[in-house]
């Protein structure tokens, strides 16, 4: 069961199965970061997520380029996973991967918001796995 320890304006802290706190933070660059607290004020950077919410397909490649720049910075800061969430209905994945090679995973915002389907399930499983957040009982 998800154990939320603290909710702040731009972050929430959840306790993992190991007892270590994970911070899920909303930031400027990247948009969302997930970090594990190893010791007081000592963090392991886990996931950096860029959210590109614009719906204009003609501008998606510029937005993916912006995500790439953000992910390159995140990699230099030690983030091990970089994900990009897009809000367009059609995305040429081959081109997107070539424009943002540092993106480990692309997700559809529509799929995530719907809270169902293969992309949502993959996103959820990966977050839970990388943060050791226990699954709810089935």
Each PLM stretch: what is its role?
Residues 2-138:
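Catalytic core segments in nucleotide and nucleic-acid processing enzymes
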